[in-house]
């Protein structure tokens, strides 16, 4: 290589490094877009907006919500995966996009594992509800009741391929249960079906269920996760009754495009964790039946990989075909 050519390449690299460093020093100098794969008005959208306010206070720039709902959350994820990696476009990611979509869509237009984790935000527990007159009062009794009545019972969930559906199917496989699945479009339909006795039991998010549990309209038999709930510590988990693989809660975390500079990532992580652990934000989560979640980013990625590994076999077993 000619000396002049080598010197020019060294100078170019130095300029790029200097530009990257200068960008990190001044970041953020304009508003940040938070791409949310859910429609406006739901609990996830509200959580995003609350977190965005806390982040903006820390960063000194607005964090603007852009709602991009779509099947599998693909549109929102693609928007961020293909965005300029400068920290100004970030993603609210969830279990749907990261642990279900890879098994349900053959040719994703991006690589999920290249999205960089900023920080986790929360989990949204899913509880198994029954009417007050249902014979079982907890998971232990429910399991025995299903075994005593094989093929005679059914359960509702808030959709095919959701964490509720997959978690219950894993529980069925783990414990040898014979109970039919009836999917509904969201919690509202599931609650109506349970009340109308279309289904015997139903998995519903705690956000939608907690007021009805406290009012005695329904009783909670179990929760689909590893640990007991802060708000309802008497409710058994599916893991503690022998279904060790069924703890698949709904979760959300923030992510950045691949290649985002480390210094920018550190600023985003610091602002996000500051917002998500603020007492007012934690109180907001608890009041809405949602649990704060604050593992390290390394533990977050291990958790996502574990969920991805567990969801694949059960999706195949129940016959869901990739599109």
Curated annotation (Swiss-Prot):
The keyword Transport does not apply. Residues 1-24 form the signal peptide. GO terms for cellular component: periplasmic space. It is found in: Periplasm. Keywords: Periplasm, Signal. It holds the Pfam family TctC. PANTHER family: BLR1237 PROTEIN, TRICARBOXYLATE-BINDING PROTEIN. Belongs to the UPF0065 (bug) family. It comes from the Bacteria. This is UPF0065 protein BP0148. SUPFAM superfamilies: Periplasmic binding protein-like II (SSF53850).
């Amino acid at each position: 290589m000619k000396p002049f050519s080598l010197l020019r390449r060294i100078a170019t690299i130095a300029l790029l490094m200097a530009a990257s460093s200068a960008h990190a020093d001044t970041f953020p100098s304009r508003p940040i877009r938070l791409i949310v794969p859910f429609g406006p008005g739901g609990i996830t959208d509200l959580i995003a907006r609350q977190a965005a306010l806390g982040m903006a206070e820390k960063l000194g720039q607005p964090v603007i919500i852009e709602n991009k709902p779509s099947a599998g959350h693909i549109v929102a994820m693609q928007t961020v995966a293909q965005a300029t990696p400068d920290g100004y476009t970030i993603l609210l990611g969830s279990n749907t996009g990261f642990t279900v979509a890879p098994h349900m869509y053959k040719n994703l237009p991006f690589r999920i594992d290249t999205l960089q984790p900023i920080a986790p935000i929360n989990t949204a527990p899913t509880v198994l509800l029954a009417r007050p007159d249902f014979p079982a009062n907890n998971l232990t009794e429910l399991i025995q009741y299903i075994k005593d009545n094989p093929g005679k019972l059914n359960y509702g969930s808030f959709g095919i391929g959701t964490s509720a559906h997959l978690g219950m199917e894993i529980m069925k496989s783990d414990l040898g249960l014979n109970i039919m699945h009836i999917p509904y479009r969201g919690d509202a339909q599931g609650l109506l079906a349970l009340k109308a006795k279309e289904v015997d039991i139903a998995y519903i998010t705690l956000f939608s269920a907690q007021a009805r549990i406290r009012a005695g309209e329904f009783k909670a038999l179990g929760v689909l996760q590893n640990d007991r709930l802060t708000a309802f510590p008497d409710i058994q988990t599916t893991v503690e009754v022998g279904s060790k693989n069924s703890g698949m809660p709904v979760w959300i975390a923030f992510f950045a495009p691949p290649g985002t500079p480390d210094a920018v990532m550190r600023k985003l992580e610091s602002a996000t964790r500051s917002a998500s652990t603020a007492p007012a934000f934690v109180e907001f989560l608890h009041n809405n039946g949602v649990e704060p979640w604050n593992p390290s980013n390394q533990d977050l990625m291990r958790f996502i990989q574990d969920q991805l590994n567990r969801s694949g076999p059960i999706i195949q077993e129940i016959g869901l075909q990739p599109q």
